[in-house]
Amino acid sequence: MLESRRLLNYSGEVLLNTPSQLSLPLSLPDDETFDSFYAGENASLVAAIQTAIHQSHGSYIYFWSRDGGGKSHLLHAACAELSLAGDAVGYVPLDKRAYFVPDVLEGMEHLSLVCIDNVQCIAGDEEWELALFNLYNRVLELGRTCLLITGDRPPRQIDLQLPDLASRLDWGQIYRLQPLSDEEKIQALQLRAKLRGFELPEDVGRFVLKRLDRKMRTLFEMLDELDHASIVAQRKLTIPFVKDILKL
């Protein structure tokens, strides 16, 4: 089996070093912080995560949503906050596990924070399930690591083949990441725009929300495009300008 080791640098990149010395970078978005996360009805989850990463080593939180909804954003935010403080953190996106081998989890129990994203992606993979189960047990035994895990459904609804892993994931604090209403999506876009130094008028927000895919990732990508276009054209965002840029 191909051996692989995980290294994390504090600029927010996970590096996988193989025996061939090939490095595979997985960049963490530098704009996905707690400040840029619009919590809506998820304030209690955000507070729980912040408490856990700063005060509760040995803690475990699982949170889920079916449509994205900001799970990865919160994991990136947690990693960024602790890594900037000089703590060792690890982020493993299991939807990209083609770049990893399960041994990537070895030794992570010595980090301050471990984030496992999209755990449903390893359902039915015996080797990965066992590796995660063993990591969970090591984290529990040492009691020095905060473990954050996300999925697209509650732990008991994931079709895991290892019953003990399903049981472990069902322990601790479990949250559903509540979806944003249309009004909250506009406010989330306005918050992101404000942090980038420009304004998204409410009428423009309503306009794009009615005409584009309403998934937040799509909307944020649209906001990036509008930000760039407005800088190049030296224009504020208006409905006619947005219609022209987005070809609506």
Curated annotation (Swiss-Prot):
User: Which keywords does this Swiss-Prot/TrEMBL entry list?
Assistant: DNA replication, DNA replication inhibitor
Q: SUPFAM superfamilies this protein is in?
A: P-loop containing nucleoside triphosphate hydrolases
Gene3D superfamilies to which the protein is assigned, alphabetical? 1.10.8.60, P-loop containing nucleotide triphosphate hydrolases (3.40.50.300)
What the entry lists under InterPro entries is as follows: Chromosome_initiator_DnaA-like, DnaA_dom, Hda, Hda_Enterobact, Hda_lid, P-loop_NTPase
Q: Which Pfam families match?
A: Bac_DnaA, Hda_lid
The organism's place on the tree of life at top rank: Bacteria
Keyword Metal-binding in the entry? The reply is no
**What's the stated role of this polypeptide?**
Mediates the interaction of DNA replication initiator protein DnaA with DNA polymerase subunit beta sliding clamp (dnaN). Stimulates hydrolysis of ATP-DnaA to ADP-DnaA, rendering DnaA inactive for reinitiation, a process called regulatory inhibition of DnaA or RIDA.
Protein family per UniProt:
Belongs to the DnaA family. HdA subfamily.
Subunit details for this protein?
The active form seems to be an ADP-bound monomer. Forms the RIDA complex (regulatory inactivation of DnaA) of ATP-DnaA, ADP-Hda and the DNA-loaded beta sliding clamp (dnaN).
Q: What is this protein's record name?
A: DnaA regulatory inactivator Hda
Q: Which organism is it from?
A: Proteus mirabilis (strain HI4320)
Source organism lineage? Bacteria, Pseudomonadati, Pseudomonadota, Gammaproteobacteria, Enterobacterales
